[in-house]
Curated annotation (Swiss-Prot):
<keyword id="KW-0539">Nucleus</keyword>
<feature type="region of interest" description="Inka box">
    <location>
        <begin position="159"/>
        <end position="196"/>
    </location>
</feature>
<dbReference type="InterPro" id="IPR039201">
    <property type="entry name" value="Inka"/>
</dbReference>
<comment type="similarity">
    <text>Belongs to the INKA family.</text>
</comment>
<comment type="function">
    <text>Inhibitor of the serine/threonine-protein kinase pak4/pak5. Acts by binding pak4/pak5 in a substrate-like manner, inhibiting the protein kinase activity.</text>
</comment>
<protein>
    <recommendedName>
        <fullName>PAK4-inhibitor inka2</fullName>
    </recommendedName>
</protein>
<dbReference type="GO" id="GO:0005634">
    <property type="term" value="C:nucleus"/>
</dbReference>
<dbReference type="GO" id="GO:0030291">
    <property type="term" value="F:protein serine/threonine kinase inhibitor activity"/>
</dbReference>
<dbReference type="Pfam" id="PF15342">
    <property type="entry name" value="FAM212"/>
</dbReference>
<dbReference type="InterPro" id="IPR029267">
    <property type="entry name" value="FAM212"/>
</dbReference>
<dbReference type="GO" id="GO:0019901">
    <property type="term" value="F:protein kinase binding"/>
</dbReference>
Length: 288
C-alpha cells in the first residue's frame, strides 16, 4: 500500500511539473504569437492599401481617357525606371518569414505565405496611359488611319468650301460613337451634322468627264433621230391601198364593166347584180 501511495504521489508530482513547464512554454510563445498577429494585420492592411491604389489608378485612367485619346501616348521612360527601382527594393527587403525560426512555423501557417501576395507591377512597354502623354509629351507613332487621312487630305481641292474637305478634316471626330437608349436618334443627329452636298448645277466636270458627257449626248441624239425616222415612216400594209374589188356593172361606168358570173349560185349572183331582169326559178327550194 505504501508503495502504491508513493507511486501515486510521484505521478502527481510529475504531472504538476509537466503543467508548469507547459505554462512556461506558453508564456514564452505569447510574445512571438503577438508579433505574428501584428505581422498578419500589417500584411492585410498593406494588401488593402495596394487594392485601393489599384482602383484609384484605374479610375484615373478612365477619367483621362474621357478627355484625351487613350491610344495617343505610351508610358514614359521615367515611369519605367521608377517601376524597376521599386521592384528592386522589394527584392532587397526579402521575405519576413525567413527571419522566423523553424520551431514555431511549420510551413503551413498564414505568415509563411503572406509575403507572396499580388505585387502591383506594370509591365514594360505595354501600359498605355494618357496621363503620361500629358506629363512627358511623348507622342505615339502614327497609326494607319492617321496616315490614310494625311494622304487623302494632301490631294484636297483648293476650294475651302468643298464638302469632301470638310468631311475629311473638320467632320472627323476622334471620339468613338456612343449610342444611348435612342440609338436611331443619335445616328440621325450624326448624319445631320455632315455638310450638305452641293447641287448638280454647281458641280463643274473636268475635261475627261466633260468629253464623256458630250459623247453620251451625241449618241443619245443619234439614236433619238433614228427612232423618230422609223416612227415617221408609213406603215406598209399587206394589201395595196388603192385596190377596189369588182362591182356589178349597174353601178360601174362603161370603162370598167364586169360581166355577171355564171356559177352554181346563179340566184345569189343575180340578186347581188341589182338588175331589173325578172328571175325565173323552176326549183325555188333548191336555190334556197
Amino acid at each position: 500500500m505504501l508503495c502504491v501511495r508513493n507511486s501515486g504521489e510521484c505521478f502527481r508530482d510529475h504531472m504538476r511539473h509537466m503543467m508548469r513547464s507547459l505554462q512556461d512554454l506558453k508564456q514564452i510563445r505569447e510574445p512571438d504569437d503577438q508579433s505574428k498577429c501584428s505581422y498578419v494585420t500589417r500584411a492585410r492592411q498593406k494588401r488593402i492599401k495596394q487594392r485601393e491604389q489599384l482602383s484609384r489608378l484605374r479610375i484615373s485612367d478612365v477619367s483621362d481617357t474621357s478627355t484625351y485619346d487613350s491610344a495617343c501616348c505610351l508610358a514614359s521612360p521615367l515611369e519605367e525606371e521608377e517601376d524597376q527601382e521599386n521592384h528592386a527594393e522589394r527584392l532587397a527587403q526579402g521575405s519576413p518569414s525567413s527571419i522566423k525560426s523553424l520551431d514555431f512555423d511549420s510551413g503551413y501557417s498564414e505568415a509563411s505565405w503572406q509575403d507572396e501576395g499580388v505585387v502591383l507591377r506594370r509591365t514594360r512597354n505595354v501600359r498605355v496611359s494618357s496621363s503620361a502623354c500629358v506629363r512627358t509629351n511623348r507622342i505615339r507613332p502614327k497609326s494607319t488611319s492617321d496616315a490614310c487621312l494625311e494622304r487623302w487630305t494632301s490631294f484636297e481641292a483648293s476650294d475651302p468650301t468643298d464638302w469632301t474637305t470638310s468631311l475629311l478634316t473638320r467632320g472627323r471626330n476622334r471620339q468613338p460613337l456612343v449610342l444611348g437608349d435612342n440609338s436611331f436618334a443619335d445616328l440621325i443627329k450624326n448624319w445631320m451634322d455632315l455638310p450638305e452636298c452641293p447641287d448638280s448645277a454647281e458641280l463643274k466636270p473636268s475635261r475627261k468627264t466633260a468629253f464623256l458627257v458630250n459623247m453620251r449626248r451625241k449618241i443619245a441624239g443619234i439614236s433619238k433621230g433614228l427612232e423618230e425616222r422609223r416612227s415617221a415612216e408609213a406603215k406598209r400594209m399587206s394589201c395595196p391601198v388603192g385596190f377596189q374589188p369588182p362591182k356589178p356593172f349597174f353601178h360601174q361606168s362603161h370603162t370598167s364593166l364586169h360581166p355577171m358570173g355564171t356559177d352554181f349560185y346563179q340566184f345569189s349572183s343575180v340578186m347581188k347584180s341589182g338588175s331589173r331582169q325578172p328571175i325565173i326559178c323552176n326549183d325555188v327550194i333548191g336555190y334556197i
